[in-house]
Design a protein with these regions (language model features):
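Beta-strand signatures of extracellular beta-sandwich domains
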Residues: 60-64, 98, 167-171, 222
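Intrinsically disordered, low-complexity serine/threonine-rich repeat tracts
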Residues: 16-33, 57, 71, 159-162, ...
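Structured interaction patches on ligand/partner-binding surfaces of diverse proteins
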Residues: 79-82, 102-135, 201, 225-263
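Short amphipathic, basic-aromatic surface patches that mediate peripheral association
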Residues: 40-54, 144-158
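Short, acidic Ser/Thr/Gly-rich low-complexity loop/linker segments typical of extracellular
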Residues: 68-84, 175-207
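Sec-dependent bacterial lipoprotein signal peptides
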Residues: 1-15
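Bacterial Sec-dependent N-terminal signal peptides
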Residues: 12-46, 122, 129-144, 244, ...
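Short Pro-Gly-centered beta-turn/loop motif in secreted/extracellular proteins
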Residues: 80-104, 199-220
Length: 263
């Protein structure tokens, strides 16, 4: 029995010794170095004229990546206003990449897919320039409400606002330029003149104020409600006209100005 133990221990020592026995397991390879890609983008209207991200409410540019060797996909998101960007490190491989422009109203535009893009280890791959073509035209569909139970036009004694006349102007927020659009108040045309606002009779709270063919942009509307010669109600909301022939639908509320003599 004693002899058997010696043989076993000697055999074990031989098998595990540093100079002989079984070879050591190989050290596994490290992760493959990642790469990046870079891109730049531009926005144009349907006539090819450059437009800004703010003009169409553009917020982000998203690259949607599909690595052909992997199921599913990933996204890389950039701020629209920067006009260019470089991704964080991504696995090397052969990619197909789609592009989306997203804004405050949702998806604004897409750009043509770029396919067969090789991302190499430790390198940056510049993509072809990306162009988003956008129908930079939209509209407005508004109602105006004094929040009086009797409505905008009824006498104050009847719980109305007692408004007898109104004016409307529309200006671009950036730069303050007047937009000389022709609105429709119900079925009646109304042409905006910021220098000399045109007076019309009281606009009822269920009467639509609409416009089409407006350049998409961020605007400030100025509505004034008069009791005879006094400006007694006002609204100065900012309104973003969306692109792609969509219309902004909103009720704008009139607030009392507190002008002396108003009822």
């Amino acid at each position: 029995m004693k002899f058997f133990r010696v043989v076993v221990l000697a055999t074990a020592a031989f098998a595990c010794g540093g100079g002989g026995g079984f070879p050591d397991a190989g050290v596994p390879d490290g992760p493959v170095p990642a790469g990046t890609f870079s891109l730049d983008w531009a926005l144009v209207d349907l006539q090819g004229a450059p437009i800004s991200c703010d003009r169409v409410g553009g917020v982000t540019v998203t690259a949607l990546l599909r690595n052909r060797a992997v199921q599913g996909g990933t996204t890389e998101v950039f701020s629209c206003g920067t006009g260019m960007g470089t991704t964080p490190l991504i696995p090397p491989g052969l990619y197909d990449i789609r592009f989306e422009l997203t804004g405050v109203t949702g998806l604004v535009a897409t750009a043509p897919e770029q396919t067969g893009i090789v991302i190499s280890s430790g390198q940056n791959t510049p993509l072809a320039p990306v162009t988003f073509a956008i129908n930079a035209i939209g509209g407005l569909d508004l109602l105006v409400d004094s929040l009086k139970s009797g409505g905008n036009c009824a006498a104050v004694a009847s719980n109305g606002a007692g408004i007898t006349a109104m004016t409307i102007t529309l200006q671009h927020v950036l730069g303050g330029a007047c937009e000389p659009a022709t609105l429709m108040i119900g079925t009646t045309p109304y042409t905006i003149d910021c220098a000399t606002p045109v007076e019309v009779g009281c606009i009822g709270k269920t009467t639509p104020i609409t416009a089409s063919g407006l350049p998409s942009d961020n605007y400030q509307i100025h509505i004034r409600g008069k009791q005879n010669a006094l400006i007694c109600y006002a609204n100065d909301d900012q309104l973003r006209v969306p692109p792609n022939a969509l219309s902004l639908m909103r009720t704008v509320n009139l607030a009392a100005t507190g002008t002396a003599g108003c009822l």
